[in-house]
Amino acid sequence: MALLQISEPGDSPAPHQRKLAVGIDLGTTNSLVAAVRSSVPEVLADAQGQVLLPSAVRYLDGGAVRIGREALLEQARDPLNTIVSVKRFMGRSAADAAASGAPYEFVDAPGMVRLRTVQGDLSPVEVSAQILAVLRQRAEDVLGDDLVGAVITVPAYFDDAQRQATRDAARLAGLNVLRLLNEPTAAAIAYGLDQAAEGIYAVYDLGGGTFDISILRLTQGVFEVIATGGDTALGGDDFDSAIVAHACAGEDVAALPVADRRALLVAARAAREALTDQAQAPFEVTLRDGRAIQATLTRAQFEQLAEPLVGRTLDSARRALRDAGLAVGDVRGVVMVGGATRMPVVRQQVGALFGTEPLTNLDPDQVVALGAALQANLLAGNRALGEDWLLLDVIPLSLGLETMGGLVERIIPRNSTIPVARAQEFTTFKDGQTAMSVHVVQGERDLVSDCRSLARFELRGIPPMVAGAARIRVTFQVDADGLLSVTAREQSTGVEAAVAVKPSYGLSDDEIARMLADSVTQADSDARARMLREQQVEARQLVESVGAALAADGDLLDPAERATVDQRLQAAAQAQSLDDVEAVRAAVQALSDATEEFAARRMDRSIRSALAGRKLDELA
């Protein structure tokens, strides 16, 4: 497959100077590291031959830490100090984390939730760094040298806060992040090289804790993500919880000790995985009070439990297709990613929706890491002939800024391919204005109050001018990792201010879904609200300019004219607070009509003043 290259700045190394770079799939349930060896991507195993590293960290009294399989085996015995599925808490607040029902003690802290352990309060970034450090050491042991960097995969629906948290975890682990790569895109790289196929593809990624659906167009080596969707709080863990609720019907599971709840989830996962190949599976747990919970779960029962969860993923898939302007029949194939896609009920329902057998010839647990390894190899400069491609990911929600009246000016629309930079010019609202506040927002609605605030900063040092004369260019840049920076620059002086957007915590899936749904259902009311705000802003501008003109040249009006203008001016000032767009428009028009002759007289005076004392030949 002939592909095009987007490469990082810098000189290309000589052929013999091969640099070691890896791809890392930092997963909710398991994590992996892969590298390209002898031009072939492969997942790297530990000393025991295991390629999957359970994403589990246990903190012991005295400072010792257990990571991976050893920690996983001890989670039922020490649940509060054994952190699993930490990816769910990346970039989240304490309220978000507590709502997940996870059996931990959450501590709210500035910026991000922390988890209380015997070694103190730890952030998800610190826990994730422990997992990444093990993978880094494994790679260096297997490859025999230090790494120049890593490509780390993230769910496509991760927002700025969650992506930044992932980067921070990598830095703590001593890793140089070459790029954050969306998991579906990584899978497309792996499958694209094997299949050499063009057309529309869906990547269905159901992991331990997150779900992503991406619609990609593959054309002559260009991987373009044309729409994304998903659920950052839905994965295999939720199927396990459904099994527990079924097996423990009549039992108040939430009231059980943490260790019992963890043991129930472990048994549920074992049953779910057994049902992949068997018609039924046992569910047996002995609680700490000696009671035994025993049940036999059939595949038919499990499919009934799983149906609403799988249905949520299919709803996301339909929304992504609508966003891309495509029908189900336009999709040529479906790539399955994530260990949870091994469930027969998932494969059956996905196949039924798209009318085609899902692609499963690559290990769904490994495909993301393999694609990340290929991308890391390229970014490190180790490319061979024909090993280049162009990656085009998209942003999930529109980015914009607040304008007068609390309106949103959309700068980068959702589903724009990244990296992307867009700029727009704005001006001042008042005469002599020397500063401007820039409020960056995210969302699909027309009013700032209905969108999510991302950042605020001020541009100072604007030269005093009449309103509307200054030119301020605001530039939005989203890099290849999906991280946003905003710059405001006054054009005549070059004075500049900027901000790198790092929200305090991420959007929940419910918030994302609500923002997208509201943009459709509230479209008419948003349009009416926008018209009203725009008319109110126009009224305010006219009232201020007429007031300034009267103060400067009020003597140009006779008493009757002045009385009329004052009356219309007062009416327009009062109209600014009205909720009737037609009433505001009428008041603006009335004031404009009343001051038309006044404006002409002011212009005449200005011209006479400019020409006073000057000779005709001086004007030639």
UniProtKB/Swiss-Prot annotation:
The keyword ATP-binding applies. Gene3D superfamilies: 1.20.1270.10, 3.30.420.40, Actin, Chain A, domain 4 (3.90.640.10), Substrate Binding Domain Of DNAk, Chain A, domain 1 (2.60.34.10). GO terms for molecular function: ATP binding; ATP hydrolysis activity; ATP-dependent protein folding chaperone; unfolded protein binding. Keywords: ATP-binding, Chaperone, Nucleotide-binding. GO terms for biological process: iron-sulfur cluster assembly. Pfam families: HSP70. Chaperone involved in the maturation of iron-sulfur cluster-containing proteins. Has a low intrinsic ATPase activity which is markedly stimulated by HscB. Belongs to the heat shock protein 70 family. PANTHER family: HEAT SHOCK PROTEIN 70KDA (PTHR19375). This is Chaperone protein HscA homolog. It comes from Bordetella pertussis (strain Tohama I / ATCC BAA-589 / NCTC 13251). The gene is hscA.
